Every structure is written in structure tokens, then in C-alpha cells.
């Protein structure tokens, strides 16, 4: 069994432990990983970092948590080294001198695009295309804030992705869609940052880091589309309830004294029956107290 297959096997076992909420034997697997020489290529291809990070978040064993943190920290160094090399390559192209500018007559000193980076023996963390460098202070600040949002909870280390590069991609897509850095642009960036940092919606951030949601998609998504699954279900339920209440109010209902309001104890009520489930299931009865406005329902 090759090294990549072995690491992938460990990752799958860790994922099962997280799903079953049973970490028995996890320490042995983490020790195996600690003794393996992990490269950026292996980190990205096996996604073992995400498995270790998920286990760390779920576990209450201090020794296991410490070992998982140690592994993630060591893998983060690989990420930092690659980011540093990428930045050095970006800065490696010297600015032209005044004499060379005079000779060419078309050189832009402020925003000259760097030459394509030379191929390196160190594999790239992401497959996202390069983005143009910007000299706009507002855009650069937005890229920095998006980077911090993507780095929330260190999921980027587990995935093995360059947050600086990915945030630049997202900002570039937002800028191209809006066309300027006015209030609409700033509000768009602010909403991305808020949703990416949301502790109740880690799935959005992980999907962006993994590439399941592309920079082009996250740049134009609405608040409803970025919401967590839990919030989407709540909104869906509220919409259904509002529709039912509207239907009940429109039909007027039937006045009766068969029901007693649990608030004012009066029997002056109006009820409406609505088929909310399949036709062979009992109808849902909605009751409104005509005295105090209290509402309730039952099947």
C-alpha cells in the first residue's frame, strides 16, 4: 500500500469515528500520522487535515486534542512555507528603472503585473488561477479581511489551501461584478466576511475552502443562499406558517364555543381546518381567540 493510500485509509477511519462519535483507537491513528512524512501534495489529495480537525473539535480527551493540534500546527508550517515562496516570487520581479521606462515608454510602475512564477518542486496548495495584483488600498484591505475570515477555526490548514490567494480570487470576482469600490462593493464584501466567520455556519467556509463553492459563486450569492441549513429550515417553516395563517385569515373560519382559550379562559373562538399533510392524514385545526387574539393549533 502506497503512502497516499495509507493516509487516505487513516482519514476514512477518522471520519467514521467522528460520524459515530466514538474515538476509540484514534490516538493510535494520530501517532501513525505523526510518524509519517506528510507533504503538501499528500495533505491536499487525502484531505486528512479535515479529518483530524473534525476529530479535535468533537473530542473531550485532552491528550487527543493536544496531539491533533500538534499535527495541524506542523502541517500549517508547510502551508506558511509555500505561501512565503509564492509571495517571494511575486516580489521577485524588480521594478523598471527610469531609463528602462524611457526606453519602453509604456511601462506602468504602479501596477506592473509580475512575470509568471517559475515552476517549483514544491506542489502548489490550490489550483485556483492567479489573480491580478491591485494597488487600491480599499481592495487590499478587503482582501486582508477576507483572508482572516477564511482562516477562522484553522479549517484552511486541514484543507491545505492558501487563504491569501483564495481571498484575492473572491475579491477580484466581487470587484468585477460591482465595477467599483463604492458602498455596494463594501456591503458585498462585508456580508461575505460575516457569513464566512459565522460559527453556526462552518459548512459554508469549508465548501469555499474545498472549492465546492467557487470564488465566482460566493462573490454573488445572496444572504439566503449563504445561510446555514438550520437557518434555511427555520425560514422555510416560518414561510409555511405565514402562508397557513394567511389562508386562515382569508377564509375567516368558523365561530364556536367548543374551544377554551388557555390565556383568557374565554370560549369565544374561531377555528379553521387546513390539510397540511397527505390526504389520508387528519387535518390541522387552527384556532383564534376572538377575545385576546391568542392562536394555537392541533391535529
UniProtKB/Swiss-Prot annotation:
<dbReference type="GO" id="GO:0006368">
    <property type="term" value="P:transcription elongation by RNA polymerase II"/>
</dbReference>
<dbReference type="InterPro" id="IPR035441">
    <property type="entry name" value="TFIIS/LEDGF_dom_sf"/>
</dbReference>
<keyword id="KW-0862">Zinc</keyword>
<dbReference type="InterPro" id="IPR001222">
    <property type="entry name" value="Znf_TFIIS"/>
</dbReference>
<keyword id="KW-0804">Transcription</keyword>
<feature type="zinc finger region" description="TFIIS-type">
    <location>
        <begin position="257"/>
        <end position="297"/>
    </location>
</feature>
<feature type="domain" description="TFIIS N-terminal">
    <location>
        <begin position="5"/>
        <end position="82"/>
    </location>
</feature>
<dbReference type="GO" id="GO:0008270">
    <property type="term" value="F:zinc ion binding"/>
</dbReference>
<dbReference type="InterPro" id="IPR003617">
    <property type="entry name" value="TFIIS/CRSP70_N_sub"/>
</dbReference>
<dbReference type="InterPro" id="IPR017923">
    <property type="entry name" value="TFIIS_N"/>
</dbReference>
<feature type="compositionally biased region" description="Polar residues">
    <location>
        <begin position="95"/>
        <end position="109"/>
    </location>
</feature>
<feature type="modified residue" description="Phosphoserine">
    <location>
        <position position="59"/>
    </location>
</feature>
<feature type="region of interest" description="Disordered">
    <location>
        <begin position="83"/>
        <end position="126"/>
    </location>
</feature>
<comment type="function">
    <text>Necessary for efficient RNA polymerase II transcription elongation past template-encoded arresting sites. The arresting sites in DNA have the property of trapping a certain fraction of elongating RNA polymerases that pass through, resulting in locked ternary complexes. Cleavage of the nascent transcript by S-II allows the resumption of elongation from the new 3'-terminus.</text>
</comment>
<feature type="modified residue" description="Phosphoserine">
    <location>
        <position position="100"/>
    </location>
</feature>
<dbReference type="GO" id="GO:0005634">
    <property type="term" value="C:nucleus"/>
</dbReference>
<keyword id="KW-0805">Transcription regulation</keyword>
<protein>
    <recommendedName>
        <fullName>Transcription elongation factor A protein 2</fullName>
    </recommendedName>
</protein>
<dbReference type="GO" id="GO:0006357">
    <property type="term" value="P:regulation of transcription by RNA polymerase II"/>
</dbReference>
<feature type="binding site">
    <location>
        <position position="289"/>
    </location>
    <ligand>
        <name>Zn(2+)</name>
    </ligand>
</feature>
<keyword id="KW-0832">Ubl conjugation</keyword>
<dbReference type="Pfam" id="PF08711">
    <property type="entry name" value="Med26"/>
</dbReference>
<dbReference type="InterPro" id="IPR006289">
    <property type="entry name" value="TFSII"/>
</dbReference>
<feature type="binding site">
    <location>
        <position position="292"/>
    </location>
    <ligand>
        <name>Zn(2+)</name>
    </ligand>
</feature>
<dbReference type="GO" id="GO:0045944">
    <property type="term" value="P:positive regulation of transcription by RNA polymerase II"/>
</dbReference>
<feature type="domain" description="TFIIS central">
    <location>
        <begin position="138"/>
        <end position="254"/>
    </location>
</feature>
<keyword id="KW-0863">Zinc-finger</keyword>
<dbReference type="Pfam" id="PF07500">
    <property type="entry name" value="TFIIS_M"/>
</dbReference>
<dbReference type="GO" id="GO:0003677">
    <property type="term" value="F:DNA binding"/>
</dbReference>
<dbReference type="Pfam" id="PF01096">
    <property type="entry name" value="Zn_ribbon_TFIIS"/>
</dbReference>
<dbReference type="InterPro" id="IPR036575">
    <property type="entry name" value="TFIIS_cen_dom_sf"/>
</dbReference>
<keyword id="KW-0238">DNA-binding</keyword>
<comment type="subunit">
    <text>Interacts with the basal transcription factor GTF2B. Interacts with REXO1.</text>
</comment>
<keyword id="KW-0597">Phosphoprotein</keyword>
<dbReference type="InterPro" id="IPR035100">
    <property type="entry name" value="TF_IIS-typ"/>
</dbReference>
<keyword id="KW-0539">Nucleus</keyword>
<comment type="similarity">
    <text>Belongs to the TFS-II family.</text>
</comment>
<keyword id="KW-0479">Metal-binding</keyword>
<keyword id="KW-1017">Isopeptide bond</keyword>
<feature type="cross-link" description="Glycyl lysine isopeptide (Lys-Gly) (interchain with G-Cter in ubiquitin)">
    <location>
        <position position="57"/>
    </location>
</feature>
<feature type="binding site">
    <location>
        <position position="264"/>
    </location>
    <ligand>
        <name>Zn(2+)</name>
    </ligand>
</feature>
<dbReference type="InterPro" id="IPR003618">
    <property type="entry name" value="TFIIS_cen_dom"/>
</dbReference>
Amino acid at each position: 500500500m502506497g503512502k497516499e493510500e495509507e493516509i487516505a485509509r487513516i482519514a476514512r477511519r477518522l471520519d467514521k469515528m467522528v460520524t459515530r462519535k466514538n474515538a476509540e483507537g484514534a490516538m493510535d491513528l494520530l501517532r501513525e500520522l505523526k510518524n509519517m512524512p506528510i507533504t503538501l501534495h499528500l495533505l491536499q489529495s487525502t484531505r486528512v487535515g479535515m479529518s483530524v480537525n473534525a476529530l479535535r473539535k468533537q473530542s473531550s480527551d485532552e491528550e487527543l486534542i493536544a496531539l491533533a493540534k500538534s499535527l495541524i500546527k506542523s502541517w500549517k508550517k508547510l502551508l506558511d512555507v509555500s505561501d512565503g515562496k509564492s509571495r517571494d516570487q511575486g516580489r521577485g520581479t524588480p521594478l523598471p528603472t527610469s531609463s528602462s521606462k524611457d526606453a519602453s515608454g509604456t511601462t506602468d510602475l504602479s501596477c506592473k503585473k509580475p512575470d509568471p512564477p517559475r515552476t517549483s518542486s514544491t506542489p502548489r496548495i490550490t489550483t485556483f488561477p492567479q489573480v491580478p495584483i491591485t494597488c487600491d488600498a480599499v481592495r487590499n484591505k478587503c482582501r486582508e479581511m477576507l483572508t482572516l475570515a477564511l482562516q477562522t477555526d484553522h479549517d484552511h490548514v486541514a484543507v491545505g489551501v492558501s487563504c491569501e490567494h483564495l481571498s484575492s480570487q473572491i475579491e477580484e470576482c466581487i470587484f468585477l461584478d460591482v465595477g467599483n469600490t463604492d458602498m455596494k462593493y463594501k456591503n458585498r464584501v462585508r456580508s461575505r466576511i460575516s457569513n464566512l466567520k459565522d460559527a453556526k455556519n462552518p459548512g459554508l467556509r469549508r465548501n469555499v475552502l474545498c472549492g465546492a463553492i467557487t470564488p465566482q459563486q460566493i462573490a454573488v450569492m445572496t444572504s439566503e443562499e449563504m445561510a446555514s441549513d438550520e437557518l434555511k429550515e427555520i425560514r422555510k417553516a416560518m414561510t409555511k406558517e405565514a402562508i397557513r395563517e394567511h389562508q386562515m385569515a382569508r377564509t375567516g373560519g368558523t365561530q364556536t364555543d367548543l374551544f377554551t382559550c388557555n390565556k383568557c379562559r374565554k370560549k369565544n373562538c374561531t377555528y379553521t381546518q387546513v390539510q397540511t399533510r397527505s390526504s389520508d392524514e387528519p387535518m390541522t385545526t387552527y384556532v383564534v381567540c376572538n377575545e385576546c387574539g391568542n392562536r394555537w393549533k392541533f391535529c
